Amino acid sequence: MAGIFDETMLRLRRCQDFELNRTPLCCALSLHHPLAKKDFLTVDDLHGKALMLIREGWNHYVDELRHDLMDGHPEIKLIDFDFYDTEAFNECDRKNALLMAVPQWEAVHPLLKILPVRWDYTVPYGLLYGHKPSAPVKRFLHALAQITERFTENEF
């Protein structure tokens, strides 16, 4: 499975990761949102807007963003939600809010657009797999490691 993660999530879900990159935290928004015509957003663009963030404690990279926005940009209304599912994306569209997202989710909802934000917040993105991967998964990880030249032969 591919996705964003942090160390807490890996521990709680009892899985390992093969990090592919640090992906930027972006904002998803309705195609009809006034900011949707822009190519990128700035933090100032978010002032006076509602920004949906996954609940505190779910990911410390998102929590860092949350705390920085709370401290430095009280003009942004932060809305917590529990889980990234269809309802969260539908709510973003329905409420004309912004939703913290990553570029890899570009096609997740037909009525949403994902825009980069000019800030330096990223989150690990990669493959997640069990602590005891099956032989086919190990072969895949070895092949991926060779392609990316990231790990030694004995690491899996």
Regions found by a protein language model. Give the residues of each.
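Thr-Gly-centered strand-to-loop micro-motif
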Residues: 30, 54-56, 101-102
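Flexible hinge/capping segments at coil-to-helix
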Residues: 13-25, 29-51, 138
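Extended ligand-binding regions for polar small-molecule ligands
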Residues: 39, 43-49, 124-156
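Beta-alpha-beta core module
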Residues: 11-18, 22-23, 86-135
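Hydrophobic beta-strand segments of well-ordered beta-sheets in folded domains
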Residues: 47-52, 76, 97-98, 125
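Central regulatory/effector-binding core of bacterial HTH transcription factors
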Residues: 1-10
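Short beta-strand-to-loop elements that line the ligand-binding cleft
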Residues: 74-85
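Secondary-structure junction motif
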Residues: 49-72, 137
